[in-house]
């Protein structure tokens, strides 16, 4: 294991120390594993809270800021934060209009955050929950509610955060974010594993020259493993799988996210998008906006994911709204 670290045990806390030291004007830390906006709570605004295990920057805390989310509970690498962490975030961002919990569909997170929501309710804070469940490889359509949440949660953060910043009520933020979630799908490919610092060994084995389609961001098994294919072939499989899962009509408008998993250069991501763009054009779909880069990673895993979101006028406007965090800026 070759990593820039001290003792693996305080890896997450030292990372948080560094982020807060670099961005004290944008972030504050009400408790050791809670990160919120520097100006939180924002009075009269719906608070947006998220959380999950470390190792996925900029997910989760990287989207804490203006026009996105208000706070994040931080767990150990690939491990759920505690209910106390999420309750600390909830208290710190409560501006009096309620709080939306928006996070990926994983068992540990659901258990701990449901408890946090109950404890917040006991304190008079209304909490609603939406789960990101965009990974089409993780379950068939008839079990879509059990799917994992991966890079598509970026679009949900963007929609919910923009709606809340515009003054929407909790019911309105929930409604538009649910609509965004219903039209968001992701499919990924892994080319190499990552290593959790405390474990000191790769999370899975994938020989050189092999790829795994549909692997999860924690190393969960995908749908197939085989020889590494060309960028065009990978793009075709990812795109066709997404379009088959949620059929789009000719003339529909979409947003596109090509996401690197941590060790894949942007050059390769753009080669992938080159092929995706041609496929979408051939299907008669109009691309409104494209995001290419690292939006939801898995430490140093090599690979990429493709996310499509089906747009309407309101979703388009919310995706285009300005946002600013230490990890993401959109004018």
Q: What are the residue ranges of the model-derived segments?
A:
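Short glycine-rich or small-residue beta-strand-to-loop segments that form or flank ligand, phosphate
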Residues: 2, 46-53, 69-72, 98-107, ...
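Short Gly/Thr/Asp-enriched flexible loops that form oxyanion-binding sites at enzyme active sites
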Residues: 110-124, 143, 268-274
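Mixed-charge interfacial surface used for oligomerization/domain docking
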Residues: 166-271
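C-terminal non-catalytic interaction/assembly regions of soluble proteins
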Residues: 241-331
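Short alpha-helices
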Residues: 131-172, 176-183
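N-terminal amphipathic/basic leader segments beginning at the initiator methionine
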Residues: 1-48, 313-331
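Short, acidic/small-residue loops that bind anionic groups at enzyme active sites
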Residues: 72-77, 121-146, 282-287
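Glycine-rich oxoanion-binding loops at beta->alpha junctions
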Residues: 56, 65, 69-96, 243
């Amino acid at each position: 294991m070759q990593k820039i670290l001290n003792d693996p045990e305080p890896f997450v806390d030292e990372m948080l120390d560094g982020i807060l030291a670099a961005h004290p004007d944008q972030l504050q830390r009400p408790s050791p594993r809670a990160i919120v906006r520097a100006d939180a709570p924002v009075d009269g605004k719906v608070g947006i809270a998220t959380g999950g295990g470390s190792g996925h920057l900029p997910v989760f805390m990287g989207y804490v800021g203006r026009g996105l989310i208000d706070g994040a509970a931080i767990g150990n690498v690939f491990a759920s934060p505690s209910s106390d962490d999420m309750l600390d975030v909830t208290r710190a961002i409560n501006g009096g209009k309620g709080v939306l919990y928006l996070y990926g569909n994983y068992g540990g997170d659901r258990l701990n955050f449901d408890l946090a929501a109950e404890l917040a309710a006991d304190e008079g804070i209304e909490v609603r929950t939406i789960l990101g469940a965009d990974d089409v490889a993780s379950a068939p359509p008839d079990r879509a509610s059990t799917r994992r949440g991966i890079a598509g949660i970026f679009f949900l953060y963007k929609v919910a955060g923009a709606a809340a910043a515009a003054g929407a009520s909790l019911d309105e933020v929930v409604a538009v974010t649910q609509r965004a979630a219903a039209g968001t799908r992701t499919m990924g490919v892994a080319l190499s594993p990552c290593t959790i610092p405390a474990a000191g060994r790769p999370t899975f084995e994938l020989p050189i020259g092999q790829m795994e389609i549909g692997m999860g961001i924690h190393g969960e098994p995908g749908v197939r493993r085989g020889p590494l294919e060309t960028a065009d072939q990978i793009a075709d499989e990812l795109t066709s799988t997404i379009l088959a899962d949620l059929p789009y009509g000719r003339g529909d408008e979409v947003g596109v996210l090509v996401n690197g998993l941590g060790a894949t250069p942007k050059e390769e991501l753009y080669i992938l998008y080159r092929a995706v763009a041609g496929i979408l054009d051939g299907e008669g779909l109009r691309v409104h906006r494209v995001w290419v880069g690292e939006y939801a990673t898995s430490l140093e895993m090599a690979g990429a994911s493709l996310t499509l979101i089906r747009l309407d006028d309101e979703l388009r406007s919310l995706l285009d709204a300005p946002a600013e965090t230490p990890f993401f800026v959109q004018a």
